[in-house]
Amino acid sequence: MNGLKLHGISRSFGDHKVLQDVDFGVRRGEIVGFIGGNGAGKTTTMRLILGMLNPTGGYITWDGEPISTENRRSIGYMPEERGLYPQMSVKDQIVHFALLEGKTRGQAKEKADELIATLGLSGREKTLIQDLSLGNQQRVQLAVSLVGNPELLVLDEPFSGLDPLAVDTMAGLIQQQAAQGVGILFSSHQLELVERLCDRVCVLDRGRVMADGAVSELQDTDQTRWELKFDRPAGEFVAELSLVASFHIEFKMSNQSSVFITVDGRDATIPQDVLEIAARFGGMRSIEPVQRSLGALLSQDYISSGRGITPAREAELESAGQTR
């Protein structure tokens, strides 16, 4: 395949197997969501792609050729921990990283001007990073990842901490890069965004790929999901229902008047127990079948309750020389 491909990648830290037979890829122009619980191995996988770690087993290719220091220069990286200098101006920040990429000062200034215009930072060239909003700091961080004209962007939690307007802006910028043929791999715990943006999703759990495909493909299961909407918070309804339920119940604290029921069987009918308890509770405004959310898919089908290795623990083991 064109672009990035991981072939049976494994990685251990001491006796702890962090990744086991990880196999997936990112094509040019494709947006791939990389999701899983804390400790699933996402950060380790990204570090392997970037060459910060070597795999215990398996190999990585770029356009069908073994990945190397040279073709890794085609990868732009935006870490979760932002690496910006707070007392440097926006333009100087971008110029600095462009110089590190090997550009001349003239080329670096030209690239900075181009990215400032492209990413909506015009008028803020001389503003210090510490004086920018978090959303604009994220734009600068994205600009830094683009100074080398990458063919692949690896973004670790790019939406973390952003308000809704800044999220929409960042999402639009990512889509813009994909439309220009750049492959995008990003991790996020904001699953609604993953559903909205991604062509494909790769689900990692305890170091193994549990699913890899379009969200619509993952949602095409032999189960039916129903949404019940009430005219008031439905906590008491859920409490009574949970005593007799043989099906999955979702009750979101952010929207306490909606309850989601998932039952086995394609096009299955709503269980009679649910209707009877809803009638006793009263105030049901509607009931209709809906697609299972990505969050429901993960919690029910793909993500275990066990924890893997966290980035902090990974760093401890690595610094102690226990990696292999």
Feature roles, as predicted:
Residues 153-157:
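Catalytic Walker B motif of ABC-type/P-loop ATPase nucleotide-binding domains
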Residues 224-301:
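Short, charged/small-residue-rich alpha-helical element at the C-terminal edge
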Residues 212-213:
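ABC ATPase "signature
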Residues 58-71:
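Conserved ABC transporter NBD signature motif
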Residues 95, 99, 107-124:
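Conserved ABC ATPase "signature" region
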